[in-house]
Swiss-Prot record:
Keywords: Nucleus, Ribosome biogenesis, RNA-binding, rRNA processing. SUPFAM superfamilies: RNA-binding domain, RBD (SSF54928). Belongs to the ESF2/ABP1 family. Residues 1-116, 248-324 are annotated as: Disordered. It comes from Yarrowia lipolytica (strain CLIB 122 / E 150) (Yeast). Involved in the small subunit (SSU) processome assembly and function, and in the 18S rRNA synthesis. Required for the early cleavages at sites A0, A1 and A2. This is Pre-rRNA-processing protein ESF2. It is found in: Nucleus, Nucleolus. Residues 126-216 form the RRM domain.
Length: 324
């Protein structure tokens, strides 16, 4: 009996401790308790999400590799450019920006290394020529269109002739400024090559509601052509235009001067005639002098005339001889 009581005592104690632990635990609503099937479904969803993420990563890698292969060219220059770009990026990371105390930073002359780097950057650039610019397209829209092929540095578009624009507006055309041709500079040659090969002879595309959806671009990559060549060409054209304007202006001034001189002479002659009329009355018009010209006939000299003269002299001499 004593043993049974002891066992009951310890069992009650354990039961009481279990009940106390259950009381300490917070009450949980059975509606929010997940069943075993729900937990298994969540685990399956997590596994599926992980698989999808891995697939997305692999697809991104594949697309990245595809675009890298599409952007690469067969030339060895592009590979060298990539290596040089990586070296330049590492050098820029190593360099730290220098803080200037003064607000106005003094411009320092470039060193030989900086000049060499600048020349290397210029040698990597590529220029694309556009023989036609779609209507209502400005440099900003063209830059947005070309940025999908690579980094665009500079863009220059030739505006329409003001006279042609006035005629177009007079006939009911759009008042917006139009452009006839243009050039775009890319930081890398491969960007320019892919841009020219993709856009040349093809529609711009994009959204069907866009105003340039069906416009066709004419693009050409200019090998061994740099932006400095374009600036020199434009400067030469402006110089020739100014020289032509100077010659036209000088010719117009000469014509005006001759017209003014002849006008002054005619006015002076008119004033002189009026003064003579006031002083001596009406001036009688003097008859114009007749010009007498004498014309003298030149003597003819020919072999036939000389032969006839000799025959005449011989016949006259024979007659005189017979008479004498």
């Amino acid at each position: 009996m004593a043993r049974a009581k002891a066992v009951d005592f310890f069992s009650t104690k354990n039961n009481s401790s279990d009940s106390e632990e259950e009381e300490d635990k917070p009450a949980v609503d059975p509606r929010f308790v997940l069943a075993d099937s729900d937990s298994e479904g969540e685990e399956e969803q997590e596994d599926g999400d992980e698989d999808e993420e891995e697939k997305g990563r692999t697809s991104k890698k594949k697309t990245k590799d595809f675009f890298e292969l599409a952007g690469k060219t067969d030339d060895g220059d592009d590979e060298e450019e990539d290596e040089e770009d990586e070296e330049e990026e590492e050098e820029e990371k190593e360099k730290k920006p220098v803080k200037t105390s003064s607000t106005k930073a003094k411009t320092k002359p470039m060193t030989k290394e900086e000049i060499e780097k600048h020349n290397k950057k210029i040698a990597k650039t590529g220029v694309v020529y556009f023989s036609r610019i779609p209507p209502l397209m400005d440099p900003g829209k063209l830059r947005m269109l070309l940025q999908r092929f690579g980094i665009v540095d500079r863009i220059y578009l030739v505006p329409e002739d003001p006279k042609a624009q006035a005629v177009r507006i007079r006939h009911g055309g759009n008042r917006a400024l139009a452009y006839t041709e243009g050039w775009a500079e890319f930081t890398k040659k491969r960007y320019a090559k892919t841009c020219a090969s993709t856009l040349n002879g093809n529609t711009i595309g994009g959204k069907k509601g866009s105003q340039h959806y069906d416009d066709i671009m004419n693009a050409k990559y200019l090998p061994k052509f740099k932006w400095s060549d374009l600036s020199e060409q434009l400067a030469q054209e402006t110089h020739n235009r100014q020289a032509r304007l100077r010659t036209e202006i000088s010719q117009a001034t000469r014509e005006n001067q001759t017209y003014i001189q002849s006008l002054e002479k005619s006015k002076a002659a008119e004033r002189r005639r009026q003064r003579q009329e006031e002083e001596g009355g009406e001036t009688e018009e003097k008859p114009a002098k007749k010009v007498h010209r004498d014309f003298y006939q030149g003597k003819t000299h020919s072999a036939r005339a000389k032969e006839g003269k000799k025959e005449l002299d011989g016949s006259v001499g024979s007659i005189l001889g017979s008479v004498m």
